[in-house]
Amino acid sequence: MENVYHKFHIPVMGTGHSIDSPIRVAHLGISSVMSIVDDILIEKICKHYSQKYSIPVEEVAKSDLYARSKRITSYLNLVDKIVALKLNELKLLPFAKGNEKTKYFELLPDDSSLKEKYKSFLKIENEEEKEITAKELTELMHAGSIDVNIMSKVDRTNYAKDGSILSDEFSDAKAALRGYAESTLTSSIVFSAGFNRTLLGFLAQFKDFYRDANGKIKKKIIIKVSDFRSAMIQGKFLATKGLEVSEFRIESGLNCGGHAFASQGFLLPSILQEFKDKRSQLAKEFIPLIKSYYEKQNWRFNESDFNCEPLLTVQGGIGTSGEAKRMIEDFGCDSTGWGSPFLLVPEATCVDDDTLSLLMNAQKEDLYLSGASPLGVPFNNLRNTGSENWTKDRAESGKPGSPCPKGFLISDKQYTDKPICTASRQFQKNKVEEISAMQIPESEKDELKNLWYAKVCLCDHLANGALIKLGISPKTKSPQSICPGPNIVWFNRQYSLQEMTDHIYGRGESLVSANRPHMFCQEIELYVNYFEKLLVTIGSSEAEIKYLEIFKENLENGIEYILKISEGKAYPNENLKSIPDFVKVQQDRLKSMYAKRTPLAIAVNF
């Protein structure tokens, strides 16, 4: 995060909603993350921006064995050029009220050294001194980081035209990694959704992930984690290959957008406190392993280059400046991630108008943890999207499932030799026939069928909103999906980038109601809801009962810790006083549902 002046970043959102965020905001110093899982979408977006900025991009032949990685590299190189172009144009501007150059500095946090220098500049009356300071400020302008994300779970094996399996380097995630590694970007790659050893091991093939002769790393590694143990395991694995984790990005398991990877009842404050208490262990454990690798390779190991701890950032459900300040001041985080609120900032993200309207008008009941993902992982969803309606219409017309045009999420081999997607027409036809043949009541058959009908073609539909917004695809042929976190309900209109940034930094009037419960309340409720579903879906074996008991104990301990936090002093724009009464309701729910539990040995399906 060198030369990054802001205390927040815009996380990855879907495959398409932040696909061009760096083009929109990086020249203004704001860092954001793009998904690089969908090279088909990326190729279309690349063509669009190549034409818009008159920057030629070489077309990649479909027959090219490295087509996927080359498409990704082409787009990332294009984004790099566009951001550099926009930043240079910004630098050439004079400091004038209301222009983009002034906006760059107005967006900065008030306590940053660059903002203070800018404020001092505004007070200078001597023209010569003002001109010198203006040049100094201009030289200090840097773009936000153009970061990318790979979901570690999305790592499909690919096949040659003759049906033979291609070598591991051509799997989806590794090809995407190659695409980033061979780009011109100096930024970071975020790995999310679990620990993929072969994927992380593939990093060692590319020199940009190692320190150069000057001790600098061109491409840094960020690991998204949900607990300290995961950070330690993945960090050690990388260290044995001489690779450093520059940042651990901690995310709430349920109070987030997209796929939800619930912890075993651990709430965010407890997780953050453990990171704070044990932070020094990270570098202490990793550096000796990195040093050993360097020595084996006969590389120079400069102690001073390695005497820093990984950065810690946090995201998931943060909705006020006070909550963000607590993350930084009390838990020692270096910055915060703000995702879903930026879906309502057209200057920053790419959301089609119909979906934008749904987001602005969304009520609590419109946001739900669904079984829509073909990965079998709970998925944060919004009701009445084009995707949801399209999926329902197909099921009701007797033609359930998607043609599966992209196939990134294929994983099931119940009916085929090669994996297929559970949202596909092929899978659902087989599944419906299987259910229809079962000797059970028709009502139960319908219930089982509906569980599978709920699966959505996320590969295609998460990309469509961006294609519609940019005028690349018509909305009549592009059902659009979106995956906001529950926090979006407190934001109810379109916002300018200045408004949202001011809200994050606590400048001016808050964009959310003063009655909004604290983010910790939201997370508690989500975990109690999740536990309630576990009680009626998990089996009755000794191991499963033990799992429930540990989950409940962790949840109760986390709630007690949050109550303790609520007794302290609140930061401005932080609703700590909402916690005690809210917690009492959830504690009563938890106690009541556990007393009435009737575990059933059926599959979990959220």
Which residue ranges define each predicted feature?
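Long, compositionally biased, glycine/small-hydrophobic-enriched stretches that function as flexible linkers
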Residues: M1-L199, D366, S370-F606
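Glycine-rich phosphate/ribose-binding loops and adjacent secondary-structure elements
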Residues: I223-I233, A239-T391, E396-S397
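Membrane-targeting and insertion segments and their boundary/processing signals
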Residues: T15-I19, D208, A260
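Short, composition-biased local secondary-structure segments
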Residues: G144-I150, L199-Y210, S280-W299
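Extended, well-ordered protein cores
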Residues: E169-I223, Q234-T240, E247, E251-G258
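Short, basic, glycine/proline-bearing loop/turn elements
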Residues: Y159-G163, I217-I223, P310
